[in-house]
Amino acid sequence: MEWIADPSIWAGLITLIVIELVLGIDNLVFIAILAEKLPPKQRDRARVTGLLLAMLMRLLLLASISWLVTLTQPLFSFRSFTFSARDLIMLFGGFFLLFKATMELNERLEGKDSNNPTQRKGAKFWGVVTQIVVLDAIFSLDSVITAVGMVDHLLVMMAAVVIAISLMLMASKPLTQFVNSHPTIVILCLSFLLMIGFSLVAEGFGFVIPKGYLYAAIGFSVMIEALNQLAIFNRRRFLSANQTLRQRTTEAVMRLLSGQKEDAELDAKTASMLVDHGNQQIFNPQERRMIERVLNLNQRTVSSIMTSRHDIEHIDLNAPEEEIRQLLERNQHTRLVVTDGDDAEDLLGVVHVIDLLQQSLRGEPLNLRVLIRQPLVFPETLPLLPALEQFRNARTHFAFVVDEFGSVEGIVTLSDVTETIAGNLPNEVEEIDARHDIQKNADGSWTANGHMPLEDLVQYVPLPLDEKREYHTIAGLLMEYLQRIPKPGEEVQVGDYLLKTLQVESHRVQKVQIIPLRKDGEMEYEV
């Protein structure tokens, strides 16, 4: 056992381990591709079983060195070619590798499903393990012959094989996960296997292709793919820095809904699901609009859908009964907002019309004070999803919207939230909702209410909107551009549209005309 203290023995051991690992890279790649065909629960077992059987095979080959040496002796000749048992094994392995790599490439490129539902799981599992062992036997022959030529001690060779296989076992799982999570890398690996299969066939016919050429080509390809993966990583990092995950997801879904599949970042499974649709619309326009509204629901706040306090029909708490009855006759809502005096700034609560009706049917005088109910109170920055949850928990459909100083800015109802998804819902009476008041004119322009939310406007007119804006209505957009209250007749260009103020009352923009422009900045119609 004096050879254990010999430094040259240890140098040979380390060299053999490195060679085993280098020669085993292609084997690991093939294992990663084969293991993907199995159900997730069987993949680890297939990798471990295949590599352990491969290690056992290499140890048996090393134990039969005398037989192994005879494999290089010529068996027969055909014309100018002389074949040994090793050459025949190389030919078989090369053609096997070419066949498997070609079939795998065909499945990847044609999008075929490699899973066969009619096949038994056990047979499939052992089929994959068998392929792993057969392929490893082919690669083992070269590595074992190399080991025999480099080291004289059998124990050193066996130790190198055991250590190398153990390292391959540890690396196989992360390598499998990495390869299968990057479709372009799978194609690259299959291309490597084609090159290796071709080199094995050439070696079987006696044409020696230096391994350095193969490794140089593989290394160059890996470098190019690394640059490609770096570019993808930088693109995703740039997108994540400029847009939230919710925004990127919403944009990708909306591109899919509009049929722009080539612009959306899709994984392989999603792309395969959509490939059969061609250029057909997957969803109709109504479905696309509704899904877009749902995806953007949490991006909107209650202040963007509220009815301004200036548009609220209210009644004084101390109003005489006759005035209350007159208001009930012309009222079209189920609730009345009660104020302390004629000032709409001081909102006390709401009164349900049905409660007033019950008072009247009982012959009692109408008394607003005893019927006042306190609605929910939302901060103006509250997103719609939390607002919807509060409506559900409180079992009420009405809320006041207040600013940071506690002043009431407006009211919002459950119907307002529902309309952000389904669009404007008609009432039993023909009432025009001022917030959705937009009509298309005969000349191609639009006339809209100044208090129409921009999120609703873009459903009709695709204006570019600043995601960090602090305004919510068309009037707010005009004031942001002008930095003052617009005057009638003033115009502002926003993207490819000209916004013209038509009507202003009490410092409030009532009507706005939206005129589409040509690319040269001229109007698309005659004034």
UniProtKB/Swiss-Prot annotation:
Residues 306-366, 371-429 form the CBS domain. GO terms for cellular component: plasma membrane. It is a multi-pass membrane protein. GO terms for molecular function: flavin adenine dinucleotide binding. InterPro entries: CBS_dom, CBS_dom_sf, FAD-bd_PCMH-like_sf, FAD-bd_PCMH_sub2, Integral_membrane_TerC, Ion_transp-like_CBS, Transptr-assoc_dom. Keywords: CBS domain, Cell membrane, Membrane, Repeat, Transmembrane, Transmembrane helix. The keyword Cell membrane applies. The chain crosses the membrane at residues 14-34, 51-71, 81-101, 122-142, 145-165, 185-205, 207-227. PROSITE patterns: CBS. It is found in: Cell membrane. Its main location: membrane. Belongs to the UPF0053 family. This is UPF0053 protein YegH. It comes from Shigella flexneri.
